[in-house]
Amino acid sequence: MQYAILCYNNEAEVFSWSKEQDAKVMADLAVVQRKLAAQGKLGPVARLMPTSAATTIRKDRDPPLVLDGPFAETKEQLLGFYILDCVNLDEAIEAALELGRANPGGSYEVRPLSVFRASALPE
């Protein structure tokens, strides 16, 4: 089963890290990522650009409203994600805990994925 690990943290804090601090966190995460890859669990990994680069589309009106910036103002922002192929939720949680030990602060949300393949859609 595939799981998404959604990585939330305080964007202002993370983007205030020095290059050395950021490189250390990324190197520590890379150790865990290599382990997950060797186990055949690691799928796509992405670090999102700052929320200032986001565009939000409000669909509660016609026509939809396109706005600069994130959908909501929150204490923590979605800063990245992992896609993992795990046997069960417990295995995905263990991977998230291991990633969390390498990354200070924030929180991880583990969520099962339902994959839709375009080739399987009716014409």
Indicate where each model-derived feature is located.
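Conserved, structured core segments of small domains
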Residues: M1-E123
